[in-house]
């Protein structure tokens, strides 16, 4: 079967986008997702994004995300920015702001005149059971309004903030993110037994109260050039710990994101993420190949 696709990226976090809205697509198997995402034998991407008709009231579209390992996941902020650019460029909507159904609710995406996209990422969740994160037997320590948790990583203790942005994140502050062994520790944290659904591992360097550098080892994808939910989780943890003030500029290997959160006043406030979205190319691929 010939499959039309669009290759996009948001700050270097790259995606294969499929239009299941204009016409229904057959369900993709995990093996087919892995084949499409393969950088040597397929198109190549961190994630595959599927645009569909919504199944709940109040939504304009449904947005599904599949990691390059074939598994479906809850949320992807960089992908959300590409999503709204895709539906706008394809003429699927004439709205500048759309409501989109994701696995755990609705999000609002707004395409600005300068081409950047603002995403209402929702409120962060810090309750360990809702991340989910097993803290049984652990002694946390308070820092600001946050609780840091000790995590055994390869025999060393790492103090993390556990945050859900609709998907699970473990955030730690490091002195030098470029020198830090992200590729060694990332997979150990991602698959740590205390995270039953695995976890995205974030490594944040504080530059100033309004600026950080961030690397994220993503669940099911490895280290990516940028991670939108990871940026939001890191900023929320930093503000809650008293280390950062909103808005925060987040520098990733793929580009820069701006995160705003009024969490110092109201932890139920939504995080707002602004950043780029770009189309790289379009094409067709034979799924049977």
UniProtKB/Swiss-Prot annotation:
- Name the Pfam families for this protein: DAP_epimerase
Subcellular locations according to the entry: Cytoplasm
Catalysed reaction(s) here are: (2S,6S)-2,6-diaminopimelate = meso-2,6-diaminopimelate
* Residues spanning the membrane: none
Q: Top enzyme class of this protein?
A: isomerase
Quote the EC number.
5.1.1.7
Catalytic residues, per the record, are: 76, 227
Give residues annotated as binding substrate.
Answer: 13, 47, 67, 77-78, 167, 200, 218-219, 228-229
Q: Where is this site: Could be important to modulate the pK values of the two catalytic cysteine residues?
A: 169, 218
Copy the pathway line from the protein's UniProt record: Amino-acid biosynthesis; L-lysine biosynthesis via DAP pathway; DL-2,6-diaminopimelate from LL-2,6-diaminopimelate: step 1/1
Database matches in InterPro entries: DAP_epimerase_AS, DAP_epimerase_DapF
Which SUPFAM superfamilies does this chain map to? Answer: Diaminopimelate epimerase-like
Gene3D superfamilies to which the protein is assigned, alphabetical:
Diaminopimelate Epimerase, Chain A, domain 1
Q: How far does the signal peptide extend, from start to end residue?
A: none
- Source species, domain of life: Bacteria
Keywords in alphabetical order, please: Amino-acid biosynthesis, Cytoplasm, Isomerase, Lysine biosynthesis
Q: Name one GO molecular function term.
A: diaminopimelate epimerase activity
- A single GO BP: lysine biosynthetic process via diaminopimelate
Entry keyword Isomerase: yes
Q: What does this protein do?
A: Catalyzes the stereoinversion of LL-2,6-diaminopimelate (L,L-DAP) to meso-diaminopimelate (meso-DAP), a precursor of L-lysine and an essential component of the bacterial peptidoglycan.
The protein's matches in NCBIfam families, at most eight in alphabetical order, are given as: DapF
What family is this protein classified in?
Answer: Belongs to the diaminopimelate epimerase family.
According to the record's subunit comment, the protein's assembly and interactions are:
Homodimer.
Instruction: Write the protein's name.
Output: Diaminopimelate epimerase
């Amino acid at each position: 079967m010939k499959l039309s696709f669009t290759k996009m990226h948001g700050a270097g976090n790259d995606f294969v986008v499929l239009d299941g809205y204009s016409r229904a697509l057959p369900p993709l198997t995990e093996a087919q997702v892995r084949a499409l995402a393969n950088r040597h034998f397929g198109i190549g991407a961190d994630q595959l994004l599927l645009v569909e008709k919504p199944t709940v009231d109040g939504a304009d579209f449904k947005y599904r995300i599949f990691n390059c390992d074939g598994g479906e996941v809850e949320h992807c902020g960089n992908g959300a920015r590409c999503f709204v650019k895709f539906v706008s460029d394809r003429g699927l909507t004439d709205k500048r702001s759309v409501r989109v159904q994701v696995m755990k609710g609705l999000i609002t995406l707004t395409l600005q005149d300068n081409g950047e996209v603002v995403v209402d990422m929702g409120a962060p969740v810090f309750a360990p059971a809702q991340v989910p994160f097993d803290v049984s037997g652990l002694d946390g320590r308070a820092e600001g309004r946050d609780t840091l948790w000790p995590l055994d990583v390869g025999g060393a203790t790492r103090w993390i903030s556990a945050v859900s942005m609709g998907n699970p994140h473990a955030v730690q502050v490091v002195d030098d993110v470029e020198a830090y062994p992200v590729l060694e520790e990332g997979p150990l944290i991602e698959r740590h037994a205390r995270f039953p659904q695995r976890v995205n591992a974030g490594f944040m360097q504080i530059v100033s109260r309004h600026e950080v550098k961030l690397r994220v080892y993503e669940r099911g994808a490895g280290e990516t050039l940028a991670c939108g939910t990871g940026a939001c989780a890191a900023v929320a943890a930093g503000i809650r710990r008293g280390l950062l003030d909103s808005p925060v500029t987040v520098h990733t290997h793929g580009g820069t994101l701006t995160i705003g959160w009024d969490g110092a006043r109201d932890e139920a406030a939504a995080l707002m993420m602004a950043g780029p979205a770009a189309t790289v190319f379009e094409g067709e691929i034979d799924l049977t190949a």
